[in-house]
Amino acid sequence: MHPKIANLCLEKKCHFASTSYISPEIKKFDKDAKSMGLIFINEVGLDPGIDHFFSHLLVKDLDKQNLENISVSYQSYCGGVPATPNDFKYKFSWSPVGVIKALNSSSKFIKDFKESIVVPYKHISNYDINNEIFEAYPNRNSLPYIEEYMFPKNWKIEEFVRGTLRLKGWKNAWEEIFNTLEKKPENLDEKIKNKSDELWNLYQYKEDEEDRVILWVKL
């Protein structure tokens, strides 16, 4: 959808802004947009977006201290959850298909100075934020952001992960979905689509219903 909208913006000579990650398709519009004096900007939401801003501030602040031979641990976690927890520990503001498929797509990060690749739903752990326990898992490929956030080359990176937060109990509430992903049936896409329709009917946000967002960036 975003490439179609971006192309329409070029045709109409309009600026383009999106909260979504920069995709290869969107990158192709960069040259034309600049030549036309248009602003095409992505990743300007909470995550991705505000988390980038906090990350750059933390890196700059630590770098100014001119410390030598340091090991650093970077964590950035964000999540949107119901303001009033429900039995499913989650509600949907967009297609459940995308949420489920993201859980089944490999995530890449650094742990104990080593690169790790995991499937998110198999790597859920408790995460404490100001004495509130959430459940967390790594999201997408974190590694390009080491350069994006301009980590100095002399820093030894013990941990670098960007991930997602969920309410405590979310893992158990989603056990049926995880079991389906684990079994890898031939008609997995069909099962995901059917489950998505069911979840959308049961757990979509109502109009004007409040949610809660949590963002935690640590270095």
Language model: regions and residue ranges:
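C-terminal catalytic/substrate-binding lobe primarily of soluble NAD(P)-dependent oxidoreductases
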Residues: 61-219
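An acidic- and aromatic-residue-enriched active-site/binding cleft used to recognize and process polar
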Residues: 1, 21-22, 77-81
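A structural signal for well-ordered alpha-helical segments within the folded catalytic domains
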Residues: 3, 49, 53, 139-143
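Adenosine-phosphate binding glycine-rich loop
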Residues: 32-82
